[in-house]
């Protein structure tokens, strides 16, 4: 079970909203979000309602302002708790529809280019666990939550292009 508290103002001030479940529309409770406390679990935050727009992965900890979670603004409109599993495994493909060279991964990968000599991933199949795909190496840039399922093209995970820099397992480390 997870628990997150979102605050309208920086440094955990102002009106707040506490949640233990997914919330498709935070605008009902808050007009903006400038700080967050994650008491348990791993959460994905979204800039728009209904789990759309820019995504931000937050683990247990305190985030006194939106720059701490690499946010571009105080616009957080939905959030979801990411389920935890014991094992993680996914397959990367160099072409759409799971064609071309296939590589399998079960650990974090800080640089897809260094490990697999690829700068783009055209399709994915998440076999176990949840992952976050980052557009840049070393877990930077746009983030995309990957749940166990098939992704036949980059648009299936919400990206505009196939640019891929790093992959990280979603694991609650505490």
From Swiss-Prot:
Pfam families: Crystall. InterPro entries: Beta/Gamma-Crystallin, Beta/gamma_crystallin, G_crystallin-like. Keywords: Eye lens protein, Methylation, Repeat. PROSITE patterns: CRYSTALLIN_BETA_GAMMA. Residues 2-40, 41-83, 88-128, 129-171 form the Beta/gamma crystallin 'Greek key' domain. One of its GO terms (biological process) is visual perception. One of its GO terms (molecular function) is structural constituent of eye lens. Belongs to the beta/gamma-crystallin family. Monomer. Crystallins are the dominant structural components of the vertebrate eye lens. This is Gamma-crystallin C. It comes from Macaca mulatta.
